[in-house]
């Protein structure tokens, strides 16, 4: 799942990166990330080893608040993606059935399935709900990715929504960001 190189950077390297125009780099705890999301900021997550495969699963991800009506347009503007491409929701595994029609699925840790958003939840998470009222979901539990789970849990405690908008930390047509340079 997370098979890429584990990157570490010295304080000097991080300081050098932060000197570039337009770069804001913060090492912050979950509560700060949640506040940034609630304030409609796009947050990039770069932690641990990168994902192996076509989906960003919380280690090289761009996150946004799924409750924002025009969230798709905001993130598409940054990523230069086509308007019709759906975004994913990363959901705390134990809450997935409260938000999505999981049918016979117990989990979807690799973001392999698009499932129907429950009718009463569509208006709550418009940024991750596609035009056909489905969402490509990633269920997250502590064993799979404790740091990412804790972040989603912090968002849930603050908003009542156990889901974050998740897309890959890259631009259209480019590979996942693998280093900060």
Task: Identify the role of each PLM range.
Residues 1-181:
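Flexible beta->alpha loop and helix N-cap segments adjacent to enzyme active/binding sites
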């Amino acid at each position: 799942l997370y098979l890429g190189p584990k990157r570490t950077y010295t304080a000097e390297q991080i300081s050098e990166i932060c000197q570039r125009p337009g770069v804001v780099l913060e090492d912050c705890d979950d509560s700060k990330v949640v506040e940034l999301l609630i304030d409609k900021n796009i947050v990039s997550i770069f932690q641990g080893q990168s994902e192996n495969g076509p989906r960003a699963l919380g280690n090289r991800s761009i996150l946004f608040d799924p409750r924002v009506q025009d969230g798709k347009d905001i993130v598409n503007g940054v990523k230069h993606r086509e308007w019709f491409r759906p975004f994913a929701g990363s959901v705390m595994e134990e809450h997935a059935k409260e938000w999505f029609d999981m049918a016979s699925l117990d989990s979807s840790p690799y973001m392999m399935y698009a499932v129907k958003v429950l009718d009463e939840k569509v208006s709550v998470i418009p940024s991750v709900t596609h035009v056909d009222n489905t969402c490509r979901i990633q269920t997250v539990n502590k064993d799979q990715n404790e740091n990412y789970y804790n972040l989603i849990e912090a968002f849930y405690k603050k908003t009542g929504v156990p889901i974050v908008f998740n897309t890959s930390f890259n631009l259209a047509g480019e590979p996942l960001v693998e280093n900060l340079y």
